[in-house]
Amino acid sequence: MLFANKNINVSFIFILVGIVSFIFADLSISTLHPFLETSRFFGSIVDINFKNADYIVEALLNTITIAIIAIFISSILGFFFAIVFKSMIVRISLAFTRSIHELFWALIFLQIFGLNTLSALLAIIIPYSAILGKVYAEILEENDTFPDELRGKDKISYFIYTKVPDAFPHLVAYTLYRFECALRSTAILGFVGVITLGYHLSSFFNQGYYSDVWLILILFYIVIATIRYWFNKYTFIPAIIASFVYLKDWGELSIDNLIRFFTSDIVPAPFKYDYSLDKTLNWFSNLLFEEIMVGVFNTIVVTQLSLIFTAIFALLFFPIVSKKFTKIPFFGHIFLVVLRSTPEYILAYIFLQLFGPSMLPAALALMLHNGAIISFLIGNQTNEMELRVDSTKKSIELYLYEVLPRIYSQFLAFLF
C-alpha cells in the first residue's frame, strides 16, 4: 500500500486518476458568446411572464399524473417481485431491467406504441418495478428480526400480519422517495417527445424564451417541495383515481409496429442486408473501435471528471447546512434542495445550450446534482457530531482539524 492510511491512499489514487482524466477531457466552450448567453439566462428570472402558462400547466399535470400512475403500478409489481426475490432468475432479471435507463425504455416503446401515454408509463414502470422489488426485498429482510419460535407455522400469516406491518413505514418512506424520482424521470421524458415539462423546457430553450424556462423550473421546484402535502395517506387514492381519469391518448398496440421492431429496427445490419463475411467484420470493427470503445472511454473520463467536481463541491458546500459553521442553515438547505431536485438531464441540457457540446455540461450537471446530495448528507451528519470541549472557535481550523477528519470516511463512501 502506498500510504498507511486507507483514506489517504484512496484519495491519492482518486486525484491521480482525476488529473489523467483532465488531460483527455474535452472541456471546450463552442458557443460564440457563452457569458452573454449565461447572463441572459440568469437575468431572465426577473422577467417571468405567464403567456405560455396554459401549455406549461398542461405539461405539469401530465408529468404529475404519469408519475402517480407509474409509481402506483410499480409499487404493486415491486412488492410481488420482493416476495420472490430469493430466486436467482428474478434477481438477474431485475438487475438487467433496472440497469437500463428510463429514457432508453422510452425510445424502445415509442417505436412500438408511438408517442402516447402508454409509452411514457411503461418507460417508468419497468425500471422502477425492478428497483422497488430489490429495495423492498432488502427492507423486508432487514426487518425480519423475530425469533423462529414467535413466527408460528403459518408463513403466510406471519408475512402478512407481522413482517409487512413491521416494515411498512420503511416501505412507504422509500416509495415516497421513489415517487419524487419518478417526477424527475417523467419530466425528462419530454426530451424524447412526450408532452411533459421536459418537452416545453427543450422547446423554450431552443427559442431563447428563458423566462418560460425559469417558470417551468420554479413550478417543478414547488411541486417537489410540496409533495408531502398533496401526496400522502389522505390524498393518494383520490390522486390515483384522478390521474387515470385525467390522462388520455393511451394508444394501442400496433402489430405492424411490433413486427417491424423485432424484425427490422433492432436487427443488426449484417443480418438485415446479408453482408459478406469481410463486410461484416469491417462493420463490427468500425462499430467496436469507432463507437463502442470511444463511448466507453469518454464515459469513464466524464465519470472521473464529475467525481472530482462533485468532491470539490461537496467539501466546499456542506458547511452551509451545518450548524457547526452557520447559525442560519435554512438558506443553505433551500440552495441544495433546488440543485438536488433538478434532474441531471435538465442541468446538462441547460449547460449544453450555454456552453455548447463537450464533456463540460455533463460534468457540471453531475457535480451540481450529486454534490448537492452529498453536501446535504454530510452537513446533516455534522449536526449530530459532538465536538471536543477544547475545540477551536475559528471556522477554518474547526473545518480542517476537527470536522473534516471525522467525516472524511463517510464522505468517500457517499462519493463512491
Predicted segments with their positions:
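Membrane-cytosol interface at the C-terminal ends of specific transmembrane alpha-helices
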Residues: T117-R178, A182-S185, P357-F416
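A structural signal for multi-pass alpha-helical bundles of membrane permease subunits
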Residues: I19-L32, R98, A106-G114, Y177-E180, ...
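Cytoplasmic-entry segments and transmembrane alpha-helices of multi-pass inner-membrane transporters
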Residues: F80-I108, E138-I139, F297, L316-F351, ...
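Hydrophobic alpha-helical transmembrane segments of polytopic membrane proteins
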Residues: L197-N232
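Loop-to-helix entry region at the N-terminal start of transmembrane alpha-helices
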Residues: E58-I66, H101-I131, E290-T303, R340-S375
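Transmembrane alpha-helices and adjacent helix-loop boundaries
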Residues: T31, R40-D47, M88-I89, S99-A106, ...
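N-terminal, non-cleaved signal-anchor transmembrane helix
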Residues: M1-V84, M88-R91, F220-H333
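Alpha-helical transmembrane segments of multi-pass membrane proteins
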Residues: E58-A70, L94-R98, E102, A137, ...
